[in-house]
Amino acid sequence: MKIGINSIIGVTTVATVMSCSSAKKEYASFELYPVRTGSLTEMEYTPEATKFTLWSPTAEEVRLMLYDEGEGGHAYETVKMELGEDGTWATVVNKNLLNKFYTFNVKINDKWQGDTPGINAHAVGVNGKRAAIIDWKATNPEGWENDQRPPLKSPADMIIYEMHHRDFSVDSTSGIKNKGKFLALTEHGTMNSDKLLTGIDHLIELGVTHVHLLPSYDYASVDETKLDENQYNWGYDPLNYNVPDGSYSTDPCLLYTSDA
């Protein structure tokens, strides 16, 4: 999911905790890398504290960078992370970080490699450069915990429709309000100028039972701050695999959930 806050670009004080000594790990092959144990989650939020973890066994140092905004501005705090036995770096920040943003900064071969939201980020700011700190329970639509897929007796019963989010609804005659957006899949009763069904209702009348979505994750080539410009890509240039792309949202800076 995409989440963001209107950016206020400015200079802030950076509090940095530096390491007195660097961890140096060398491995003869990938097979010798330690295997991460436990959850792959890189951010675990509670109002009292947030735990951050990053699996990076070859890193010499890892820093957590905290931001007020999803883009622009500077990190307001830098926190040293500690290395565990399985190659995972971790730290806990004992304060309420709800709606803040973060990146990891990794040093390898005595060189800082730049910022990353982590490969397991599930919420990011505009254009996916920083991960977002959110309360997962608060993002679920009402009744989400009771949602169940329709029963399927046999895979042979499936009638599959391959769909690209933008192409499915973007046509000017589609009769769909949220053209090219995720919300287009929630609209019913839409018709074109010839009074023919469009959108989800058209798939239903075709007898489609399953929809195969072309890439929906966050990809790099579309600038989500310039959606009024003519930008297009099918999405085969992934940036954050576990985050829906912001260009398909009605506003990349806002959070909306729907159980449709």
Predicted regions and their residues:
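C-terminal motif of bacterial Sec signal peptides marking the signal peptidase cleavage site
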Residues: 18-19
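Conserved small/polar residues in nucleotide/adenosyl-binding loops
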Residues: 256-260
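Bacterial N-terminal signal peptides that target proteins for export
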Residues: 1-8
